[in-house]
Amino acid sequence: MKETDREAVATAVQRVAGMLQRPDQLDKVEQYRRREARKKASVEARLKAAIQSQLDGVRTGLSQLHNALNDVKDIQQSLADVSKDWRQSINTIESLKDVKDAVVQHSQLAAAVENLKNIFSVPEIVRETQDLIEQGALLQAHRKLMDLECSRDGLMYEQYRMDSGNTRDMTLIHGYFGSTQGLSDELAKQLWMVLQRSLVTVRRDPTLLVSVVRIIEREEKIDRRILDRKKQTGFVPPGRPKNWKEKMFTILERTVTTRIEGTQADTRESDKMWLVRHLEIIRKYVLDDLIVAKNLMVQCFPPHYEIFKNLLNMYHQALSTRMQDLASEDLEANEIVSLLTWVLNTYTSTEMMRNVELAPEVDVGTLEPLLSPHVVSELLDTYMSTLTSNIIAWLRKALETDKKDWVKETEPEADQDGYYQTTLPAIVFQMFEQNLQVAAQISEDLKTKVLVLCLQQMNSFLSRYKDEAQLYKEEHLRNRQHPHCYVQYMIAIINNCQTFKESIVSLKRKYLKNEVEEGVSPSQPSMDGILDAIAKEGCSGLLEEVFLDLEQHLNELMTKKWLLGSNAVDIICVTVEDYFNDFAKIKKPYKKRMTAEAHRRVVVEYLRAVMQKRISFRSPEERKEGAEKMVREAEQLRFLFRKLASGFGEDVDGYCDTIVAVAEVIKLTDPSLLYLEVSTLVSKYPDIRDDHIGALLAVRGDASRDMKQTIMETLEQGPAQASPSYVPLFKDIVVPSLNVAKLLK
């Protein structure tokens, strides 16, 4: 208390100090005192009121507790009186057991009386129900069946209530109504038959289907009522619950499965297109059935049955099972394509599930895949493996067929521009196109894989093609009379290389997206290289053919016979031009290279004739005559190859200029200028060697040994550097060593 008083005094002092901060506030002390007195009186009044209220509550509570105590005592006394009365009336209650039994018996008899009419008429109702079922009057039959079951179930329930352990009476009642279960089963069979043909029935007689649904719905209500009573009494009549709604969906599901499986009319042995036909029948049947279900069947079923949704799921599951079964068979490559195209594309297309007549109830996005990704992957792997084997076999067969054409006695066909060709490129790329078009129907990814496969196999195929072309050339060289049209078919082989190149580019442009092109492009340089090699070998073989015919005339060059008036170069020009009339059938890129190579080789052979020292001029007159003949023949060759190279837009004079330059060395009349002339020759043609110079001087026939030695030693000190565009002519010309040794002596 003292502590509280001290705190109150301290608080008061603090409040007074807060009020009297300035001198002028002392004048208001009396005013402050009265205000605080009023506050104190107000607080004390509220405090007294609160205390009084608490006291009143305590007083009321004590009064109520006192009343409750009195009530408890009264209840205690009443319970004692009841207990006393109960003990006194036990004997009286036991004497009323007979009354209780009589009441139960009365209840049973009342139920029996109530069902008496039905009990006596059971056989008649059974016959009528059977007749109605046979007549197809299903609703009336079900009404009578319900009456029979109601009578049976009512009697059995009363017996169960009276004596649940009395199985004899229960069996007696059940036996008396024994035909009821048979009628129920017979009616169920009729219902299931209607449901199995529901898609037909709903179009011909929708009322019948509605009757079936009404019967099932009635049975569902009875099942629910009986199950509710079971929770209270434990009694369930025989044959309940029937679960006809669940059985209805089971029947529909089995019907859908049978319908899907029954669409396969053919086998692989009887029809190669069995799977395509099977899948098309499935597509048509499923689409028609779902349209009927959406437009007609939904009108015959209660909304909560969700009949269309359930049928859609049934068809989807049945299709998935069927596709799994088909996928597990040993399918051929074309059959795998047909299956995957149908599963991945057709099924979700407007031809089937996206059909406008099924919208908006069918949402393709919510449907699970018909085949799992694992199965699809396995099928694709099998397809790629089979396709690889097939492509290898097809390419091998195509090449063998083409090889047979190479030995024919007739010329190959020409394209619209007159270039020789065989059917090989067309056959190969037609086969590639077909497989790529098929793969594109399945997916972009598979199309890319097939394209990569085709290009890979094309690479291997071109290597075999190159080997076969080489063998073809070698066999011809062993017997130049066979094959008869060797030149024409070799031209066709060369042209095929260009066709292959163009077809590869076209194929990639058509079937390859830009973003994946980089992954496939590395095969292109390899194939281009092989094709160029094949064409180069082919051109080389054709030129070999030319130079075999020219060999005799080339050997006449730079000989006494040549100097005396041989027409070898005339024959060479005529022969080359004649061959190039055939070579006009070669496509431009390769013909251009071939013309340049023929020009180079003719000039090289001419220079080789010079370097082989077939002639040694004995006088300035002979040197002049020989040199002038060389210049004339160089011009003759220049004219020929200008004619052959017309349209190529290239300078063809350089090679023949070499012959003229060599002729100038031979023609020189002042031996003192020989070193200068030779130096000029070497600077123009850096690949010329000292043995070439020695042979050239030997052909002149007037160079002394010292002059030869001086020229060669001087040239060895400062070899000329070749320009990047220079095409070597002398490096392949071999000078007989015996001749060089003699010259140096």
Swiss-Prot record:
GO terms for cellular component: cytosol; exocyst; Golgi apparatus; growth cone; midbody; perinuclear region of cytoplasm; secretory granule membrane
Tissue: Expressed in epididymis (at protein level).
Modified residues (N6-acetyllysine): K28
GO molecular function term, any single one: cadherin binding
Keywords attached to this entry: Acetylation, Cell projection, Cytoplasm, Exocytosis, Golgi apparatus, Protein transport, Transport
Location in the cell: Cytoplasm; Cytoplasm, Perinuclear region; Cell projection, Growth cone; Midbody
Single Gene Ontology BP annotation: vesicle tethering involved in exocytosis
InterPro entries xrefs: EXOC3/Sec6, EXOC3/Sec6_C
Role summary: Component of the exocyst complex involved in the docking of exocytic vesicles with fusion sites on the plasma membrane.
Family: Belongs to the SEC6 family.
Quaternary structure and partners: The exocyst complex is composed of EXOC1, EXOC2, EXOC3, EXOC4, EXOC5, EXOC6, EXOC7 and EXOC8. Interacts with EXOC3L1. Interacts with BIRC6/bruce. Interacts with MYRIP. Interacts with SLC6A9.
Name of this protein: Exocyst complex component 3
